[in-house]
């Protein structure tokens, strides 16, 4: 028989911070705005707040391109205000979940900037960097946003990096144990700040088909959707169990 968890029989409400409540008149919702509506949300019967990304980001994909996992984007407020939100929610017996993106980061993230400066160095291994086929992409995979999943690295004739989404969202190499450990450290840090958990975006994409084989084209562009090399790959469960043991168990 399954033990009852804290989230069972709870009502969750998603907040898209940009459009929720603006308190400083700049036209963008902010953390103080969320705090100001906690009593209202509690009266509605809400127990859990799932908040879409508020991390530092160039906002190419509405915050799903994170350039610093440890910082709040100034458009939403400060880290002190985030801690205050968590504190005020707990006073009302409410729980805060944050959206988290760990399949990829922003191309402005420090790791990726270092990888581009030295693709064959330590940080290059944080991403999927492959040689092309005589200057053409390594495979014929199509990104979720259209076009090839491969982007040529500036200054190199035949090196490409993988991005399942926008080119500004390079995929992190989950096969690299150091990358996984850094992700788990970040998750644990946020839990230490008082978060109750996360909604993890695009998690099915973290395990790739490492044969790097072309697929049968499924469109006139000669490409095949990238989900075909993630949807049926063995091993994602191992990554998720490792994350569970490292981050979410006592």
Spans of model-derived segments:
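Acidic/aromatic-lined carbohydrate-recognition and catalytic surfaces
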Residues: 2-188, 192, 204-250
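Receiver (REC) domain switch/active-site residues of two-component response regulators
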Residues: 196
